[in-house]
Amino acid sequence: MLDDRKFSEQELVRRNKYKNLVDQNKDPYKITNWKRNTTLLKLNEKYKDYSKEELLNLTQELVIVAGRIKLYREAGKKAAFVNIDDQDSSIQLYVRLDEIGQEAFEDFRDLDLGDIIGVKGNMMRTDHGELSIRCKEVVLLSKALRPLPDKHAGIQDIEEKYRRRYVDLIMNHDVRKTFQARTKIIRTMQNFLDNRGYMEVETPILHSLKGGASAKPFVTHYNVLNTDVYLRIATELHLKRLIVGGFEGVYEIGRIFRNEGMSTRHNPEFTSIELYVAYEDMFFLMDLTEEIFRVCNSAVNSSSVIEYNNVKIDLSKPFKRLHMVDGIKQVTGVDFWQEMTVEQALELAKKHNVYVEKHQESVGHIINLFYEEFVESTIVEPTFVYGHPKEISPLAKSNPNDPRFTDRFELFIIGREYANAFSELNDPIDQYERFKAQLEEESKGNDEANDMDIDFVEALEHAMPPTAGIGIGIDRLVMLLTNCDSIKDVLLFPQMKPKE
């Protein structure tokens, strides 16, 4: 119950100040707007080179700005300095009793850190050389009834930082910059693909079948149809239907939902882009992916050399290309190019202490387990790892020279996957058989196996051209380009465990 809320002494003081304002018919919450004519960033840029004397002699227009009080210090009984922040910058205010009047100055001295104020005034520079606004009018626009954390200590509890992101954003300019960079990265990617003639589309979030990726879905219920449906684990199968329908380049940036673990790299709800281009293959996508990473980096960083987890990466260099089997051979000496039986592969797994679940008892699965166990963490420079086994790639085209493997790649940087791409399987007969194999895996306990999507098979039976498709994790890309350790640092409101 709201009546049971307990307030600290400082919160009670603030509430009492607000009550006094209401009693004086000065309720700030009734103010509907404050028309600014500039921003703090623009002021700082415009006047950064003006001296104190130049500003005194300058014929100035009145500046009208707004911001949140972050610092307050009195200069005697008749003046005070205040620092305010807006979205992109901060500035100092100089407020004098003889310039704003007795009543307004008394109201001003009752303000608290965190209050949002509107200001009118002229630009000046203090004796210490700090660019400031000499205030002619100060108006309380919104009263902060809760105090901010200590300016220097900030939010100490990392969980609270994510739960109360609004406070984190108030206190930390760098956090705001990270999310502004995220928006720039997404917009840059959209512009890049739009300029190549590819079309951004929207496909359903609620799916009647699970498919397009190997993942556990969230299940919900459609009341009007009285049936369970899944939140999408990928956008792939709908986008490929559009290629069948005649579009030659489509992409979607959107939320994906996977009912799996949470970690510094995983959030159950995340953002990805999937792109499909007709008449191209995975090698085309390798080149395109390099371009995407470079153009997105240029949008938010001044150098092609970025630092992530204390490792420097040069995105201007060509990305390496490594066959999965070659990578395993280089690290472990095991040669999976040799034809072998499942029994022989299981013996190798046992020898190298690689755990194999029941549904993974195939040569292809064991190859992938070796890669994940021994190779993945050794990759530092951007590397396209390609040639995934057919068993773990139910939607990728088989390699024509060695059908045990597929024309598929994943991009790894510093041991993390950033992209997954195929030369798409467009053979409806092969696709039907692979869906059947997925059902067999499900019967052996693989709860990430795809359903049989007969409608998708029928779509392929109308003929899909040779097609290249890729998925890129937006959140991980933003982490890389902004040097953030945790996925929670690039999600405005990450999923958190319920409070006790």
Curated annotation (Swiss-Prot):
Q: What is the protein's name according to its record?
A: Lysine--tRNA ligase
Record text on cofactor binding: Binds 3 Mg(2+) ions per subunit.
What catalytic activity is recorded? tRNA(Lys) + L-lysine + ATP = L-lysyl-tRNA(Lys) + AMP + diphosphate
Query: PANTHER family this protein is in?
Result: LYSINE--TRNA LIGASE, CHLOROPLASTIC_MITOCHONDRIAL, LYSYL-TRNA SYNTHETASE
Q: Which gene encodes it?
A: lysS
Similarity comment text for this entry = Belongs to the class-II aminoacyl-tRNA synthetase family.
Q: How does it assemble?
A: Homodimer.
Which residues are recorded as binding Mg(2+) 2?
Answer: 417
Q: Which UniProt keywords apply?
A: Aminoacyl-tRNA synthetase, ATP-binding, Cytoplasm, Ligase, Magnesium, Metal-binding, Nucleotide-binding, Protein biosynthesis
Q: What is its EC number?
A: 6.1.1.6
Originating organism: Mycoplasma capricolum subsp. capricolum (strain California kid / ATCC 27343 / NCTC 10154)
